[in-house]
Amino acid sequence: MIKLKEELFQKNHKILTYAIFFVVILLLEYCAPQVQSAKLKNGDLLFVTAKETGLSGAINNVTQKQKEASFDHIGIVEKAENHWYVLHAAPKGGSQKQELKSFLTDQSDEDQKVMIYRLKPEYQRSIPAALKKAESMLGKPYNFNYILDENSYYCSDYIERSFRKDHIFKLEPMTFIDPKTGETNTFWMEFYKKKNLKVPEGEPGCNPNGLAASDKLEKIGEL
C-alpha cells in the first residue's frame, strides 16, 4: 500500500512538473513581446543591423557612416488597436504592414539585431502625417533597382517619402564607390550589368545608414 502511494506521488509530481514547465513557457512567450514593445513609441524607427556579405554587405560597404553599427533595413512602428506593427518595404512582400513579433522573428532568424531610433521632441509632430503617408504607400512592389520611381519603393526610400512633407530626411547623391579602392564596388558593377542598367552613381537616393545619421534622430537602444 505504501509503495503504491509512493508511485502515485511520483507520477503526480512528474505531471505537476511538466504542467508548471508548460505554463512558464507560455508566460515567457506572452511576456516577451510585451517587454519589447514597452520600449516603443508610435512612430519610432527600427533599424536592422547589416550582414557582412551579399546584398546587405554590398549596401553597407558603400554607405556605412557609423563605426559602432551599420544597417541594411529600416521600418516605422505603428500602434493600432493595442497591437504593434512595422510598416516597411522589403524584398519579400514589398511595402507592407507586418506584426512586430513577426518582424522581429524574421530578423532574429537572420542573426540581425534591431535598434530603436526616435525623432527628437521638436520633430515628433511629424509622426501622424508620416504614418498616414506610409499607410497610403502599402501594397507597392519592392524597388530592386534602387533607382527612385513612383511605382515601387526600397526600404529607406519608403521611410524618406513618409516624412518628406516635413523635410525630416533628405535625398543625397548615391555612391557605389568602394572607399577602400576608390573604384565602383565590384558587386554593384555586376548587379547593374545583369539588369542592363548603368550604375546610378550620383543620382538622388537614400540608405538606412544615411537616415540613422540624421541629427533629427536619437538612438534609444536595442529592441
PLM feature spans:
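Glycine-rich catalytic cores of cysteine/serine-nucleophile enzymes that process amide/ester linkages
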Residues: 51-118, 142-150
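Activation targets extended, charge/polar-rich intrinsically disordered C-terminal tails
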Residues: 146, 150-223
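N-terminal Sec-pathway targeting helices
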Residues: 6-19
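Active-site nucleophile-His-acid catalytic modules used for acyl/amide transfer and hydrolysis
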Residues: 111-175
